[in-house]
Amino acid sequence: MFTYQKIIQLALLLSGVCGALASIDTDSHLSPKVLEKLRPTENLAYEDDSLDDDTWRSKRWEFDYQYSGISTFAHLPHVRCLVEQSEDFDIAIIGVPFDTAVSHRPGARFGPKGIRSASSRQMAIRGFNPSLNVNPYESWAKILDCGDIPVSSYDNQLAVRQMTEGYIDLLSRKATASPASNNLKTAGLAKDGIFHPRLITLGGDHSIGLASLRALGHFYGNVSVIHFDSHLDTWNPKRYYPSYWHSDRADFTHGTMFWMASKEGLINNGTSIHAGLRTRLSGTDYYDYEEDNRVGFTFIEAQEIDEIGVNGIVERIKQVVGDTLVYLSIDIDVVDPGLAPGTGTPETGGWTTREMKSILRKLDGHLNLVGAEVVEVSPPYDDRAESTSLAASDFIFEILSSMVKHPLYDVKK
């Protein structure tokens, strides 16, 4: 039942609404009277009287807080680059939500979402990297979050084709930044004579690296691989499983992709390196290490950091890769599972996140990076603090910083 008092209150409310509607001009712009009420008071320092009303009303909503906005990596602009074919960029973040080539725990298909969510505290307004003296989000580079490559979870052969074609599509574009008139650097010049953009992949299980290397091979030929991992990932599939259960489709796993890439001639023989190894080998001898050497890798075991330190690790990597084009592959399980539990094949005795960040920073300026990936983040197995996703997002920040600070050609800034 409406009482007399409630009817009076309703009438007053309707009167106020009608008055507000009447104050709006026919061209949908707010009237000066309403604008005056919306504008900040004169004693607020952030008001810019030089801006017209439309600009002012738009500009005051530009800023996102760390916890607001849709989930893109570091609040970067999101473009579905595979759909928007005319979109160019210098560096793109691309997710590959795939985990059906794992040997143990799944969940890495949720890695791209987890890493993006964990990156929410990275913002242009507070993105300066004091160790590398650069803010990658306020620089010459046009950086986008290009979303994910849609991949099948039912057919791994189809999924690899989707990944490869997606990578080639993105890499085929011309980088946004023009070369400087006095450009003397040609390291990043592709076989077609064009400077192409660079991609950083959010995995996904580690098998996605094969598709990335196939795409890079299309533009650059073979490249060197710096591979941070607790496992070799150069397992010979013919030895790994009994021959009577063998199938060609089963050859492709997150532990065989670098072996396959080497056999396809995608990896430089002798200038690629694993770092952080600490797993068991197959059989009763060192066959896995011998096979790894045959496919062109050398390696650093995790415990060597106790003897030669971070600087020693960095020097070994630099000596191996030299000035070749480099693909940087970081399996999050290189980090000790006590610090990064959210992964599919954890191994105890790993490096700390501080050691990994220090290695990445000390490699800055010494690598011709053509691409990178951070893989094997499995949010379902992460802790309540989302430590694994956070570590992955921080590693990507270091990679982005290095890519921006050291472009593969002299850019016009």
Swiss-Prot record:
Mn(2+) 1 binds at residues 206, 229, 233, 331. GO terms for molecular function: agmatinase activity; metal ion binding. One of its GO terms (biological process) is urea metabolic process. CDD domains: Agmatinase_PAH (cd11592). PROSITE patterns: ARGINASE_1 (PS01053), ARGINASE_2 (PS51409). It holds the Pfam family Arginase. It catalyses: agmatine + H2O = urea + putrescine. GO terms for cellular component: endoplasmic reticulum; fungal-type vacuole. SUPFAM superfamilies: Arginase/deacetylase. Its cofactor is Mn(2+). Keywords: Hydrolase, Manganese, Metal-binding, Signal. InterPro entries: Ureohydrolase (IPR006035), Ureohydrolase_dom_sf (IPR023696), Ureohydrolase_Mn_BS (IPR020855). Mn(2+) 2 binds at residues 229, 231, 331, 333. Its EC number is 3.5.3.11. Residues 1-22 form the signal peptide. Belongs to the arginase family. This is Putative agmatinase 2. It comes from Schizosaccharomyces pombe (strain 972 / ATCC 24843) (Fission yeast).
